[in-house]
A protein has these predicted regions:
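Hydrophobic alpha-helical transmembrane segments
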Residues: 1-74, 92-98, 103-252
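Histidine-centered active-site/metal-ligand motif
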Residues: 77
Length: 252
């Protein structure tokens, strides 16, 4: 239970006032609970959307839902996306890219990445069927792939928060993270008769693998920032696949 509480404290702004003795082993074990945190975030933003849709047009309700996600997670992963974009698209050496990621200032590429991240989320969710369900599941998908991004990866720095996770989680933790996240998505979609969405799970995992290979080719490993970027990329992919299914009348 302490591991779950610690994971919630780390990845959200939910005020849980409990002191926990932290070590690297507990942090790495907590990766198995990341999809659970994704479910909490998803339920929160879906709840905000459900409340707002009774008062505002769909687009405004979606905007509030996206803002709700930022409020509950503090822009934790969005910050990683910005830092990753600034570094990867700087066209510098690996060493300089890693320095750019550590810079607290946001550059042009980071601003562009944040703009398109938020804009795509708002536009995609506005045009998807069953937005409440999709808003719940998308953050789970983003956390589901984290084990794959970390397992046996190289951490290209001597220290940092990512050092507690990257390359340190066990195969069991990686599989638990993937199976819990994927299992929840599959079960929910089957129970709601949207069985086709089960196909989204392997697509997201394959995309995450491709993302990892791309990042590793650029900086020689994975960092905490690239994990956050991966989560955002997979969420957007999840939304995009659902919109495509809506357009093709696969989901109604």
């Amino acid at each position: 239970m302490n591991t779950l509480i610690l994971t919630i404290q780390l990845m959200t702004r939910i005020p849980i006032n409990k002191q926990i003795d932290v070590d690297d082993k507990m942090l790495s074990r907590g990766v198995a609970y990341w999809p659970v945190v994704g479910a909490i975030i998803g339920l929160f933003q879906a709840g905000i959307f459900w409340l707002c849709i009774h008062i505002f047009p769909v687009s405004i309700a979606v905007l509030f839902a996206v803002l709700a996600e930022l409020c509950i997670n503090g822009g934790f992963h969005l910050d990683g996306l910005c830092d990753t974009a600034d570094a990867i698209y700087s066209a510098r050496t690996r060493e300089r890219m890693l320095e750019i990621m550590k810079d607290s200032r946001v550059g042009t590429n980071g601003v562009i990445a944040a703009f398109f991240d938020l804009t795509l989320k708002i536009l995609l969710v506005t045009h998807v069927a069953h937005p409440v369900l999709i808003l719940i599941l998308a953050p789970i998908a983003g956390k589901m792939v984290q084990g794959l991004l970390m397992y046996k990866a190289i951490y290209p720095r001597d220290k940092g928060l990512g050092h507690s996770y990257i390359g340190r989680i066990s195969l069991a933790t990686c599989l638990l993270c993937t199976c819990i996240g994927g299992g929840v998505i599959v079960v929910v979609t089957v129970l709601t008769m949207h069985w086709w969405m089960a196909a989204v799970v392997p697509i997201c995992l394959l995309a995450a693998f491709g993302f990892r290979r791309y990042i590793e080719s650029k900086i020689g490993g994975m960092t905490g920032d690239t994990l956050g970027a991966g989560s955002e990329v997979i969420e957007i992919l999840f939304y995009a696949l659902c919109v495509a299914a809506t357009t093709l009348d696969i989901i109604k």
